[in-house]
Amino acid sequence: EITTRLVGSEMCIRDSYTGALDELFDCQFGRLPYRSLRFDFEHYEKESYQGHSVVNYTVSEDFTRITEFKYLTGQKNTDGTTIVKEYPFAYTGAEGEIPYYAILEPKNQELYEKYHALAGGLPHFYLLGRLAEYKYYNIDAMTKKAMELADAIMAENTKR
């Protein structure tokens, strides 16, 4: 626990962690498996590429999604359109790679629980998000959870 004095009153620091939990502990039990993504941007000199903002692909292509940005931003530009194709690959922790999605299998959950137990020993330390909690969240659920955590921390502070 970190305490500090601010204008004569004691204050307890609370930490919320949103990064990969295995990396916080230097992968001492092994690396948690994640799916990463490579993004390939392409520009086309035509009004539209696919007619929709996002099209998901399951098995027909090597990429999993194409996003055409003009439909997300409301652009009226008719001189061209830009898309991005998302290609999945296994996250290895190499420089420049980003872990995006937990690979939710029982053996991976068991490994996560080891790291979770280590984090549980840290006072006033809160895990939040896809990487720290090793689960998938939609943005609306994640926003709600973050606000609930903030409320809980504020309520805890008023008890002190």
Label every model-predicted segment.
Residues E1-I13:
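Single conserved hydrophobic/aromatic residue that forms the stacking wall/gate
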Residues L6, Y17, L127:
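Short glycine/serine/threonine-biased micro-segments
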Residues R14, T18-E23:
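Glycine-/small-residue-rich beta->alpha transition segments that form the dinucleotide
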Residues E23-K159:
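C-terminal segments that line or cap access tunnels to active or ligand-binding sites in enzymes
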